[in-house]
């Protein structure tokens, strides 16, 4: 079981879930060392057609590149999670992971001075799977951020055109 890289916030959670789920009877916990080492471990397992069990997060290029399957877990339990995040938790109990919420915030004056921009930002949403796929394309192609953005605009029109008025979408399409 490839654990979270040492020093990362996920480290006590993965270590405590390892204990709470009684995985020591079946799996050896392997510390990843770093994010890059963890990424390389996944790539190596995939290239060898070997199974991989471990921690990873999304959205990322790795999730977009490989056919990863999220392990089923019980629902998030706030009380159990408090102990999971504590490296010194004496009796960890199982909980699903807390959902990371992404919020778009603007200062009040922006809403007043640039209501069109504020409206655009309020509509902006991209599913994690799509972000991961775009990041994977960028990594596979050694793309610059501008190239990745252009790739997104060309290939994910159904998403971004919901954020802008039709005339703006037409201008963006014409510029591509």
Residues covered by each model-derived region:
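Domain-level detector of nuclease and nuclease-like folds
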Residues: 39, 98-100, 107, 120
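Soluble non-cytosolic domains of exported or imported proteins
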Residues: 5-9, 32-36, 111-115, 125, ...
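C-terminal functional modules
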Residues: 119, 123-176
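Metal- and O2-centered redox machinery and metal/ROS homeostasis
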Residues: 15-27, 37, 51, 89-91, ...
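Short, well-ordered beta-strand elements
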Residues: 1-2, 121
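Stable alpha-helical elements in mature extracytoplasmic
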Residues: 10-14, 38, 42, 113, ...
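A bilobed periplasmic-binding-protein/Venus flytrap-type ligand-binding module shared by bacterial periplasmic
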Residues: 100-113, 136-137
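Ligand-binding pocket segment of bilobal, Venus flytrap-like solute-binding proteins
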Residues: 4-84
């Amino acid at each position: 079981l490839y654990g979270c890289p040492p020093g990362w916030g996920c480290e006590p959670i993965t270590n405590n879930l390892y204990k709470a789920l009684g995985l020591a009877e079946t799996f050896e916990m392997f510390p990843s060392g770093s994010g890059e080492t963890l990424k390389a471990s996944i790539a190596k397992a995939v290239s060898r057609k070997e199974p991989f069990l471990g921690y990873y997060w999304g959205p990322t290029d790795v999730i977009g590149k490989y056919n990863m399957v999220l392990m089923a877990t019980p629902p998030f339990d706030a009380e159990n999670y408090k102990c999971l995040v504590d490296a010194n938790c004496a009796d960890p109990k199982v909980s699903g992971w807390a959902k990371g919420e992404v919020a778009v915030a603007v200062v009040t004056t922006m809403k007043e001075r640039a209501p069109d921009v504020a409206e655009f930002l309020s509509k902006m949403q991209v599913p994690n799977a799509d972000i991961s796929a775009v990041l994977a394309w960028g990594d596979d192609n050694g793309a610059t951020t501008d190239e990745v953005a252009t790739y997104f605009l060309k290939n994910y029109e159904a998403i971004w055109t919901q954020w802008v008025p039709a005339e703006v979408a037409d201008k963006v399409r014409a510029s591509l």
